[in-house]
């Protein structure tokens, strides 16, 4: 799946963007002006997310829609966070004794893990006996006991079959953005509206919001071109002169072509002192092959730099190797599932981690970097059936730091990509202060892809709407534009 508006082949140079080899993080004056409004390129604006342990599983919704009202996860415990949707059967995301979970996350009732490495699977397939038929605490078994008949409108991520044959089974994923191309679009008329909104004393921010939030990215590029053709002026330069702060950052992000925005975000994350590793993970571990290849080409053409070389110089160890694997854009994207391969991969992952002293990191890297997301979901289910522990918990026990975060991001996207972004948005706004750069980046980049599903998962996971949380954490025109984008 590629972003709407992406070119089918290659990535042509963007008019007005900096020529190859220009080291400035923004194009020069007179071209595509980004200089002063954005946060410093080396800024460490991204908060640290706890490094290990996910909350107890809440069950993955089956095809047909949202869980019935009784199937929603209960309100979080004080200081806790809700369950992560889409987890295969088994132990859930709680970390066994000796492992560290997310701070404040409620842990499911413990089951016997024993000390040290997990027990070697018995011939029956489960260390220590039979796999429990239900989640701890009586939650429904994945996936058949979740009643979704009354919520048929919800586009779900179809659970994989429990039939472990060698025949492939097709899995489809349906997503939908909140922003769609406007009907009866007229770029010249929109350009005139924006010019009038910025003409004279003061700025009509509401007029700007009405146009920008209701046009697709491709239509915004046409408005930008029409503005220059009609008035001989650069629209972005005029907007920058009228706006400031978070509103300026949001407007500029909306007018960047999607691939350029991802490439720009990666450059910003690695430029200057320090590295914003969470940004590298969020982009490189969640994009499709086509998107990644276009990002790599755009990064080279617009900034005159090699993305892989920059990753190698800014990261190290197993985290570096994981990101280098990701920026190749060579993941298998076949949507069918080979259950025999899933069982074999599950066994290999067990033997590379829980079933031995130490960890064979290269085995985890190879499987998680090359298998399709539907195939990884089947592998996670096979792993839970075999090891009596979910693969996310095992990754938390075997890895730490950013490589752990990267591997878990891949697995979370395989389970339920909208839930991953919902969680990122939640932590961008939770607590004191707001990580506005993460909020802007996710809302903008997912607005034409799967923001509808992200909103649905946000409400299911946190018992409040995304719009409600945005309204409470932002203000003014910035809030109005964000709410207009998310459809609130």
Curated annotation (Swiss-Prot):
Matching Pfam families: Annexin (PF00191)
Ranges of the Annexin repeats in the UniProt entry: 185-256, 257-328, 340-412, 416-487
Region Repeat-rich region: start-end pairs: 1-143
Compositional bias per record (Pro residues), positions renumbered to this chain: 1-18
Record GO biological process: autophagy; epithelial cell differentiation; membrane fusion; negative regulation of gene expression; response to calcium ion
Domain of life: Eukaryota
Compositionally biased intervals (Gly residues): 89-102
Modified residues (N6-acetyllysine): 233
Positions of region (3 X 5 AA tandem repeats of G-Y-P-P-X): 5-20
Keywords: Acetylation, Annexin, Calcium, Calcium/phospholipid-binding, Repeat
UniProt note on tissues of expression: Isoform 1 is expressed in brain, heart and skeletal muscle. Isoform 2 is more abundant in liver, lung, kidney, spleen, fibroblasts and placenta.
Keyword Calcium tagged: yes
GO molecular function term, any single one: calcium ion binding
Region listing for Disordered, in residue ranges: 1-49, 71-143
Domain comment, as recorded: A pair of annexin repeats may form one binding site for calcium and phospholipid.
SUBUNIT field: Interacts with PDCD6.
Function of the protein: Calcium/phospholipid-binding protein which promotes membrane fusion and is involved in exocytosis.
UniProt family annotation: Belongs to the annexin family.
Name of the protein in question: Annexin A7
Upper lineage: Eukaryota, Metazoa, Chordata, Craniata, Vertebrata
Gene from which the chain derives: ANXA7
